[in-house]
Amino acid sequence: MAKAPKANTPKVTSTSSAVLTDFQETFKTSKRAYFAQIEKYPKLKLIDTFCFFLVLLGVIQCTFIILIRDNFPFNAFLAGFIICVGQFVLLMSLRLQLCNSFPGISKNRAFAEFIVASLILHFVCLHFIN
């Protein structure tokens, strides 16, 4: 009776430690890049704070709906959640445009587009509530 050849399987611990090391390096690099960007453009702190507030508000809304287990004014919940997500997306696009990622777009134009898009988003969500 012939013995089956042993398969060469990598150790799980070495793979997971390599992934953890890569993650730590990536996190440190991202953190350094973020703080360098904040140092170069200090107004981004306000945008980031507002984005954090929007994420927190969306989590609170979802938690409230889960805890009360009733979604009677469902259109109000949807409008509130959609406005949090939509405003977050608009702020991220404004943040990208303010960091000179798009050389053809001036900062004033980027801010004006943000204001118009925010007004449209709020108008749509307000009319969605009824």
UniProtKB/Swiss-Prot annotation:
Q: How changing E113K affects the protein? A: In OST2-6; ts; reduced activity
- GO BP terms, alphabetized: protein N-linked glycosylation
Q: Which UniProt keywords apply?
A: Endoplasmic reticulum, Membrane, Transmembrane, Transmembrane helix
One GO cellular component this record assigns the protein to is: endoplasmic reticulum
Primary localisation category: endoplasmic reticulum
Phenotype when changing C62S:
In OST2-1; ts; reduced activity
Output the InterPro entries linked to this UniProt entry.
Answer: DAD/Ost2
Record topological domains on the Lumenal side: 67-71
Similarity section: Belongs to the DAD/OST2 family.
Oligomeric state and interaction partners are given as: Component of the oligosaccharyltransferase (OST) complex, which appears to exist in two assemblies comprising OST1, OST2, OST4, OST5, STT3, SWP1, WPB1, and either OST3 or OST6. OST assembly occurs through the formation of 3 subcomplexes. Subcomplex 1 contains OST1 and OST5, subcomplex 2 contains STT3, OST3, and OST4, and subcomplex 3 contains OST2, WBP1, and SWP1. Interacts with SEC61 and SSS1.
What does this gene product do? Subunit of the oligosaccharyl transferase (OST) complex that catalyzes the initial transfer of a defined glycan (Glc(3)Man(9)GlcNAc(2) in eukaryotes) from the lipid carrier dolichol-pyrophosphate to an asparagine residue within an Asn-X-Ser/Thr consensus motif in nascent polypeptide chains, the first step in protein N-glycosylation. N-glycosylation occurs cotranslationally and the complex associates with the Sec61 complex at the channel-forming translocon complex that mediates protein translocation across the endoplasmic reticulum (ER). All subunits are required for a maximal enzyme activity.
Name the chain's protein: Dolichyl-diphosphooligosaccharide--protein glycosyltransferase subunit OST2
Lineage of source species:
Eukaryota, Fungi, Dikarya, Ascomycota, Saccharomycotina
